[in-house]
């Protein structure tokens, strides 16, 4: 059932839970997420980020996500994640995304406001919800270093990358954005060390603004950290890294087990369709697990 982002997030706010937002990189990830949604009976958000364009073009992603969203028996939003420009967001709207994110977080504050205002005006005219970002959410690299999320604009980083509650209040007031991604210590990717989360900051921001708050970099946190963040005001949690990692691990284990058995017996080979099914099942189980965590009420 295809719905807009605002509908899902307003429901999550009322219930004091969070909705999972899962990046889609191929047919199998969409299949896994929607199967998990139906089996748990919970709404989900499927989203596409341009960082995954080497694997899946945005136009193909839109067709895949819209197909699965319409045939799934629970509410599903189709979201553009980390739109880097006005033009990218407009492309998402034309392709049928029910919500878009304009990520101008690496721009100066006033420029972030102006670009977000432009996207909100155009998107709302098409009944499309808009998420924006304030603060700096970093991406973890394999060597342990970090890079800032968002678009390719190069600006000086502020001393405090976390979202300021008063700045968030003014940002939402001026932009009329439907959801706000905030920075409080999470990062995209795999954590090499335990993240230092300022969960109290989430509560402070929640007191200042009424729109749903979004957590990026959800993979790798504990159940307690997720649930405290939700209790403090998070309504949408982006999750992809570990879902993808578990799928790869399941496929690797199956191949290794088959190769070991083949050395001693007449073991049937592993075909590509076997790998696909194994990956879908592994992702589905992980998505079901985090959906249940996000949906637990206080």
Where are the language model's segments positioned?
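Glycine-rich beta-strand-to-loop/alpha-helix junction loops that act as flexible
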Residues: 185, 216-219
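Glycine-rich nucleotide/cofactor/substrate-binding loop typically near the N-terminus or early
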Residues: 80, 249, 258
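Active-site oxyanion-binding pockets that recognize sulfate/phosphate
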Residues: 19, 102, 273-277
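Extended, intrinsically disordered, low-complexity segments
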Residues: 255-298
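Generic N-terminal amphipathic, Lys/Arg-enriched alpha-helix
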Residues: 4-20, 266-272
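Alpha/beta enzyme core
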Residues: 3-11, 26-51, 58-75, 83-208, ...
């Amino acid at each position: 059932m295809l719905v807009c982002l605002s509908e899902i997030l307003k429901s999550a706010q009322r219930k004091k839970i969070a909705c999972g937002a899962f990046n889609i990189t191929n047919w199998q990830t969409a299949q896994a997420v929607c199967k998990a949604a139906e089996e748990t009976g919970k709404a989900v958000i499927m989203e596409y980020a341009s960082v995954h364009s080497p694997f899946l073009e945005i136009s193909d992603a839109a067709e895949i996500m819209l197909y699965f969203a319409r045939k799934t028996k629970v509410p599903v939003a189709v979201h553009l994640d980390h739109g880097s420009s006005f033009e990218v967001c407009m492309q998402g709207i034309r392709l049928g995304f029910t919500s878009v994110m304009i990520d101008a977080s690496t721009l100066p504050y006033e420029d972030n406001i102006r670009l977000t205002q432009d996207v909100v005006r155009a998107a709302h005219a098409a009944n499309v919800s808009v998420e924006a970002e304030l603060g700096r959410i970093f991406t973890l690299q394999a060597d342990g270093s970090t890079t800032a999320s968002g678009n390719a604009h190069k600006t000086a980083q502020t001393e405090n990358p976390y979202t300021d509650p008063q700045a968030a209040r003014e940002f939402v007031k001026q932009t009329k954005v439907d959801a706000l991604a905030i920075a409080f210590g999470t990062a995209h990717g795999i954590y090499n060390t335990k993240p230092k989360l300022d969960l109290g900051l989430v509560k402070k921001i929640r007191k200042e603004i009424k729109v749903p708050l979004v957590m990026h970099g959800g993979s790798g946190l504990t159940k307690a950290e997720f649930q405290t963040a939700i209790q403090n005001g998070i309504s949408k949690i982006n999750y992809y890294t570990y879902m993808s990692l578990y799928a790869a691990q399941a496929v690797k284990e199956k191949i290794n087990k088959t190769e070991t058995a083949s050395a001693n017996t007449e073991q049937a080979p592993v075909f590509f369709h076997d790998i696909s099914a194994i990956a879908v099942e592994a992702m589905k189980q992980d998505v079901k697990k985090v959906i249940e965590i996000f949906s637990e009420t206080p």
